[in-house]
C-alpha cells in the first residue's frame, strides 16, 4: 500500500512528519493519518510527494519497485 511507501521514503531520508506536512500544506496530525493508512491521500498530494522525493507516482502507489524516475 502507498502509506508504507511514503513512510519508508520519509524515514529513509530522515525527514520528520511535520516537515512533510508542510510540503503538503497540511497538519502533522493529518499527515500522520495518511501515513498510517487511516486517511486516503489525494492524487495531487501523491504527485507532490513524488516530486519531493524524486520518485515516480507509480513507485509511491506500489505499481513498480524501482525508485528511478
Positions of predicted regions on the chain:
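Short amphipathic alpha-helical segment with a characteristic S/N-K-E followed by hydrophobic residues
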Residues: 40-41, 60
Amino acid at each position: 500500500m502507498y502509506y508504507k511507501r511514503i513512510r519508508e521514503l520519509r524515514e529513509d531520508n530522515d525527514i520528520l512528519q511535520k516537515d512533510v506536512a508542510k510540503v503538503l500544506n497540511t497538519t502533522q496530525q493529518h499527515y500522520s493519518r495518511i501515513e498510517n493508512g487511516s486517511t486516503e491521500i489525494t492524487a495531487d498530494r501523491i504527485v507532490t510527494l513524488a516530486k519531493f522525493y524524486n520518485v515516480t507516482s507509480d513507485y509511491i502507489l506500489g505499481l513498480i519497485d524501482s525508485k528511478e524516475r
